Amino acid sequence: MITTRARLALAAGASARWASRVTGRGAGAMIGGLVAMTLDRSVLRQLAAGRRTVVVTGTNGKSTTTRMTAAALGTLGAVATNAEGANMDAGLVAALAADRHAKLAALEVDEMHVPHVSDAVEPAAIVLLNLSRDQLDRVGEITVIERTLRAGLARHRQAVVVANCDDVLMTSAAYDSSRVVWVAAGGSWSNDSVSCPRSGEVIVREHGHWYSTGADFKRPCPQWWFDDHTLYGPDGLALPMRLALPGAVNRGNAAQAVAAAVALGADPRKAVAAVCTVDEVAGRYRTVRTGAHEARILLAKNPAGWQEALSMVDKHAAGVVIAVNGQVPDGEDLSWLWDVRFEHFAETFKTTPVVAAGERGTDLAVRLGYAGVEHTLVHDTVAAIASCPPGRVEVVANYTAFLQLQRALARHG
């Protein structure tokens, strides 16, 4: 039951959201949520009451996995979700307020917000994807995040924790939970988990397995896993899974989404069919016609995300554009460029035009040069696409470069 004060707070938030839209200042979800929370701090708890909620968190893949989880849960009924990725408290309030009658919710939540958000929404399931470096000026060391998540999970023993057992840090966060579903969702980026988060000793990796040399801490046996075309689950379950989205990383995201939905009672076959329909996530992965080119846009925000995005680039594309900005939301320190393995481009894309673009295109060009990647430099991303031969162009962009490109393409029609 929502109190009178909360109703007034939500009405004020709706007015703020409307004002933001009509004045052209944005969709207004954040300002609407902020206004509502300012007037009633308990509004998130009240909006979540009576719902079965899945919280999705991790450094990379939150938006995609949340979208897939919402699709899978949709086989059970109406689902409230923050589809645009506003993953802090105000965005969650806006998402739940927008669909007050849905009895299910799939919420993307920023890693550091998970403990207090879980206290408010009492999730039925919590999905733990991966942890790696991402804007250290904002969230601090990833070991701190792991300990914060671990402490938060300890307060919610009733929640099913769907954890990626290939990620050392997320495994540690979930290790002590009483209701864990382990998913082998993949973990190709291991640079940020070379030591055990529990003992500080070395993590040894061999043949897809890992273990700590200093504690009784090792990769759990997964209940869900996948290969190129099949999702495997408990009791001999094997279901064909052909996603609309590219890459092994998205098959891992889908596996965790299905596992979470099944934990809430979804039929596995229907859940898999639902995640296979997801073909775009807030503009990511979509293909846009611009002049003589079809540009597919991939988003990457940190070294691990870049490594995954680069692995999805079509080898047969007419051109590849890599766009990098260095604004505050991106992280102004671009030293991480040297952690991304661009070297494989030198061989894989030997005859394909590669264009460095974005506000920090010069920094990127230096990195590509050291990696031995033949390239040109065109700072404007739309112009960079136009400089490629006609046909399909793969565009990989970091956060603000991605947003700028979306706006520019919208203006170009």
Locate predicted features.
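Adenine nucleotide phosphate-binding catalytic loops in nucleotide-utilizing enzymes
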Residues: 5, 179-304
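Glycine/threonine-rich flexible loop motifs
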Residues: 136-144, 331-335, 405-407
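Phosphate-binding loop of NTP-binding sites
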Residues: 4-182, 189, 195
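Residue-level signal for inorganic ion chemistry
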Residues: 108, 129, 162, 253, ...
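Active-site beta-alpha connecting loops in nucleotide-dependent enzymes
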Residues: 281, 293, 299-377, 412-413
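Short, charged/polar "capping" segments at the starts of alpha-helices
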Residues: 114, 168-172, 329-332, 360-366, ...
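Short active-site oxyanion
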Residues: 103-105, 157-161, 293-295, 348-355, ...
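A glycine-rich beta-strand to alpha-helix segment
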Residues: 381-413
